[in-house]
Structure formats: structure tokens, C-alpha cells
Amino acid sequence: MAELTLFHYALSPFSEKIRAMLGYSELSWLSVTVREMPPRPVLEALAGGYRKVPVAQRGADIFCDTRTIASEIARLSGKPELALENQPEEVQAFVRKADLDIFLACVIAASDGRMLRRLIRETSLINTFRFLKDRINMGRKARVKAVRGAEAKRKVLDHIADLENRLSQDFLFGPTPCIADFSAYHGLWFVCDLAGKPWLENAPRVSAWMARMKAFGHGSPREITPEDAIAMAASATPEPLEPGAESGTPVTIAPSDYGRDPVSGSLVYSDDTKTVISRSSPKTGLLHLHFPKQGFRVVEQTA
């Protein structure tokens, strides 16, 4: 069975969510480090220009959005608690809020001089300006309500207080972690660890929980090149789909919140939780791109 390949960069919160899951699941995995913003030629080739990071690959199957990546990790590792669709509605509602409203509040609350200096230090001054311009342009096209700095801080502090109240056990919904823990973790990792906000000082349960989450580590990834990843895709064929395949209608699919660059392909599978489209090129051969159903808009293309 092919190993999972993760396309990510160090400062990406959602990449940290998946890296922590990989540490918890104890899966071996391959790593391809990509730029903080487009152009990303390897993802243009494999994911049709899908612009959010991380993206995962296993052979000729490409997984876009952390929900489909998490479901694949759950399947490969035999840890069903990592798949959102396996959770009760209470957990699913928590994850939806943590992955959008709380995440955006964490990013805005973290955006100060310290975070800017860190970005410059880990990339370059010119790359930082390009990154900021890219994120400003992405924000202008977003369909989510932006919050200001003070409101973002209040949201994050309220979130921390909620976690403090929830943590009567080692993890948010019981004695062992589930997808909710990883969804809550990555935003606080960004605002408290990377940006250095001291907002966990009066939240001992959350601080201890964060330490437990960090202790999972990232496993032992092996770095490969973008060319290696493309070669693996070209030499593989997509995994067989479950019964219920679609007819191959030309479609575009795009996130409905932000980073809404559409990806085109042929619809080959759809159910209550995911959509799969096919794409093909001489460079990669036939690929199947997997997207979550929720939060994505599929538009049929007419001649």
C-alpha cells in the first residue's frame, strides 16, 4: 500500500492539524514542502490549482481539505475517531465552528509584529510581502465575515474558556482524542505557540491538554521532491470507487468560504460526505481528486 504524502509548509495551521494526526496515528508518511502561497507547480499538476494547504496524495488519489485527509488517515490507521463522519452531531458542530470561526479568529489575533518578524525570519522580506498581498486578495474574495483584532481576541479567549470547562477528562470528548481535539489544537498552536500570546496562563487544563497534543509529535516523515510525488502519481492508478459512481459530467468544484479557486474535472463519485472528480494529463496520468461535500460547491459545466 502506498504511503500518504503530505504537501505542507511549517507555519500552516491546518498542516499542523494533519501533522499532529499523523503523529497520533503512527503512520509513516512522505513530506513535500511547498511555498506559503501560489504558484505551487506540484499542486497545480496534482490538484488542478486547488489553493488551500495541506493536500495529501496516495498514489493517483489526491485528497483536498483536512476533512478528506483526516478520513483517509482514519481509514489507513484503523482510527475511526479521526473521521468527522463517524462522530455524533455534537462533535461535528464543534469541529465546524473550530475549523472556521475560531480558526479565523486565531489567525487575526495572531497577526501582529511578532508573527510578522517570524515570517520574515523563516522565509524572506520579499516573500513576506508577497504572502501578505496574497492573503489580502484572498480575504477580499472570501464569503466569510471578517472580525477585527479586538473581536478576534475576545473570540479566542471565549474559546479557551469553553475548552477549560470541557476538559474534565484528558481530551475534549472523553479519555482519548478524536477529530475535535485536532481541530481545536491547530488554531491555539498558531496563536499561542507561534505568535506567543500568553492566553493559556490562566487555563491550566487547556495548557495540559495542549502538552498532550504536542506529545503526539509528527511521526517520522521522509522528505521527497515534488518530482518524486508526480512520478508516483503517474505510475499509479486511482483506487476503485465504491458503488454509486457518477457518469463523468464535467464540473468545477471550489470551497464556499475562502480560497475559492475552482478546480475542473469530471464527476465520478458523490455521496453524503464526499465528492470525487477525475482529471488527466500526460504528466500525471489519470487522477482522482477527493473533496468533502460540506463547504464545497459543485457546478455542472455546460457546453
For the regions a language model picked out, list residue spans one by one.
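N-terminal short leaders/motifs
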Residues: 2, 6-14, 208-224
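Preference for short coil/turn "hinge" residues that link or interrupt alpha-helices
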Residues: 36, 170-172, 238, 284
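GST-like fold's C-terminal all-alpha helical module
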Residues: 98-215
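Histidine- and/or cysteine-centered catalytic micro-motif in compact active-site loops
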Residues: 187, 226-229, 256
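Generic structural signal for buried aliphatic residues
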Residues: 251-253
